[in-house]
């Protein structure tokens, strides 16, 4: 570790958070989880294990719709687990999907599969007694849930660009390599969930599981990584702790990456020491130094990230404490090379190409719109059965996108008609507005314990109301990137939307506006603690002006800033909470 006198280590003067004690005492993430699995008196986990299961890709939840009713009956909340699979780049094979579908139908409370905006799937409502069978199933089909939550590098995103097939494959391979390189070395996951063996702590174990990159207490906080291929910013590359922007050479081949750090969208209502942020550029690295750069950033965050205050522990706060130049210098010291100047690139859009597109390899790719990523069977839309039927005949692969949609990828010309017929039969191909196509929400109620307001369950009707507003003002064919998140933790990425709703209380939200279409700008708070109907009324007035006063092709988010309806967020750590503190500079 570097000299502790270096700027950025002031937090060491304060007591460590209890999570640091928990990790130290966990026997490399094993804890006493095996003992808890045998306890049939509760559906949940006790003590440290409640937190430790997160390192294995799970969260303990309960059904909040019936929580009060159960407490009234002197019953504990109906506890179960959320499981998040590790799936770098979101690619999954049809045979894997068939098994994933079967488990969801037979063993989860909600009998659904949730596609996430981090390009993976989640199970909701897995009972404790089915956890080991679930992990063994995943292991048997080449999958796992290692490090998809808690203080580690989480699922690595990669642009889903089926048209540029060769470049996408190259970038995807690096996304996989980064994911594997930054995984914990501990066998704790396999010992607990696959082998079911109790391993006592010993000196030999410490030598085997030294964790040369993550360290024995892993990272100070969650850590998110993405790989993007311009001009498509579908992964919201500015929202992650570590980002790789693919750069092509003159022959169209991948030659290296621009490396960006310090993005993140979570904050806390009323806590001005917290803020969402867009990532900063460190510079360019050629392909052969990609993993060294990833490791250098992780080690710098490991050593300098705040282990006292978890609310200020993400990379953006480490950079604020060290300065960007100081952070860059430490990363360069770790990887023993210097960053080259950032190479030119441009992002122009974020949305998925819904429908059929043809790749340069002449294969076809069908992107299916899945509202909020929820794959389930309803009488009018048996989507879950539809995807299962596709998996039974599809010869290519599936790709989960960072917009919560599903690509049926690598379809041969002769198979295209069959794939389309199945998709149409089960309602997987539908006519939707541009507004709905680009909308997103987190899960929120009833399963998320942090949710302050609804998100996924109110999004469909809310978008229908906004569709009426756009039609009223003759801009129904336009797109405004709209997102709802049930709390300020930011899982719905509302802090990179043109219209972002952040849950404040049941039925009430903070309304942020002024993000941009390419995902480069944080939206600012416009109205606080208002209802969905009040938000619709506010948007009605703003869209009326946008429809008549905008410049040619001017996006809604750009219009509200140019028209001085709202001030831009320029430097989030300075002016996110107070627009009067804006320092004139280039708007990010």
Curated annotation (Swiss-Prot):
It comes from Actinobacillus pleuropneumoniae. The gene is cysI. This is Sulfite reductase [NADPH] hemoprotein beta-component. Changing residue 40 to D: In strain: AP213. Binds 1 siroheme per subunit. GO terms for molecular function: 4 iron, 4 sulfur cluster binding; heme binding; metal ion binding; NADP binding; sulfite reductase (ferredoxin) activity; sulfite reductase (NADPH) activity. It comes from the Bacteria. [4Fe-4S] cluster binds at residues 442, 448, 487, 491. Its cofactor is siroheme; [4Fe-4S] cluster. Its EC number is 1.8.1.2. Changing residue 373 to V: In strain: AP213. SUPFAM superfamilies: Nitrite and sulphite reductase 4Fe-4S domain-like, Nitrite/Sulfite reductase N-terminal domain-like. Coiled coil: none annotated. The keyword Transmembrane does not apply. Keywords: 4Fe-4S, Amino-acid biosynthesis, Cysteine biosynthesis, Heme, Iron, Iron-sulfur, Metal-binding, NADP, Oxidoreductase. Changing residue 523 to S: In strain: AP213.
